Amino acid sequence: MNMRNINVITVLSVPGKTVSDDFMHAVLSNCATRIVLPAPEKFGSESLPDNFNMTAVGVMKNSEI
């Protein structure tokens, strides 16, 4: 039985909120196994409103194999 850490990044829209670079760096640096970014097929910055910001939330899950 092996234990494997699976790290998932979920992108959430937070209108009117700013996210510090330190927070983003801390979340992404703790996500060494896998990053999953769900996005529509056609995705571009021009399709986002001016007040749109992305917040990355790290979720760590232990999975038995």
UniProtKB/Swiss-Prot annotation:
Keywords: Plasmid. It comes from the Bacteria. InterPro entries: Conjug_TrbD_put. Pfam families: DUF2689. NCBIfam families: PRK13724.1-2. This is Protein TrbD. It comes from Escherichia coli (strain K12).
